[in-house]
Amino acid sequence: MQVRMLGRVDLRETVEAMQAFTAQRTGDTPDVLWVCEHAPHFTQGLAGHADHLLAPGDIPVVATNRGGQVTFHGPGQVVAYPLVDLRRAGYYVKEYVHRVEEAAIRTLAHFGVTGHRVAGAPGIYVRLDDPRSHALLPQRPRKADPLEPAAAVPDFTGLGKIAALGIKVSRHCTYHGVALNVDMDLEPFSRINPCGYAGLPTVDLSTIGVHTTWDEAASVLASQLAIRLAP
């Protein structure tokens, strides 16, 4: 997999470039990983609801065709876009998601942090009371949503989200990807229901005591994705 470190790039232009790359690629087009960061933007996925944008203020909102709901991108966040031909790679979408999440978990482990999955809520989470604990996270049952009694939501008690995942698959090829919070202004997350979950805490490496550079975190995540997404 080719890795391209793009630095700070325009979000809308990057989304358009991913779409164009995917539309034009052939069976011989090499897979590529774009790693970048963006100026402050909220992005809405296909499952997004306007009421999850509580008070966007002066931060632009961009509608996208990725899966998932609303999230925030900004400086100090590593955004990785794997452009992978799944048919050639030999695995399906569910396995692809697992591999991307595993790359984020291994990246956190590099910095001494234990990342966790939560059933029914894509992305990676950390324990707020002890981010370095290796104890397994019990998979708790979903709890009732008082606003939607017929629905149920994952139990995020004691957890904070540190990496968000949102993908699109077209003609067996992936785009969009994963965002890892490194050292960023987290205030904009209070203006939304992150990924559609009211009150879900969002953290970055800095707030849980890990001080590193964007470049180092980007390098580790890129390396892990290249390893995990290999055929």
UniProtKB/Swiss-Prot annotation:
Its EC number(s): 2.3.1.181
Record bears the keyword Acyltransferase: yes
CDD domains linked to this entry: LipB
Domain BPL/LPL catalytic: 27-231
A molecular function (GO) term: lipoyl(octanoyl) transferase activity
Residues annotated for substrate binding in this entry: R66, G67, G68, Q69, V70, T71, F72, H73, A164, L165, G166, G177, V178, A179
GO CC annotations, alphabetized: cytoplasm
GO BP annotations listed: protein modification process
Keyword annotations of the record: Acyltransferase, Cytoplasm, Transferase
Active site per database record: C195
Organism superkingdom: Bacteria
Entry-linked InterPro entries: aa-tRNA-synth_II/BPL/LPL (IPR045864), BPL_LPL_catalytic (IPR004143), Octanoyltransferase (IPR000544), Octanoyltransferase_CS (IPR020605)
Xref: NCBIfam families: lipB
Any further remark recorded for this protein: In the reaction, the free carboxyl group of octanoic acid is attached via an amide linkage to the epsilon-amino group of a specific lysine residue of lipoyl domains of lipoate-dependent enzymes.
Protein name: Octanoyltransferase
Organism from which the protein derives: Paracidovorax citrulli (strain AAC00-1) (Acidovorax citrulli)
Species classification: Bacteria, Pseudomonadati, Pseudomonadota, Betaproteobacteria, Burkholderiales
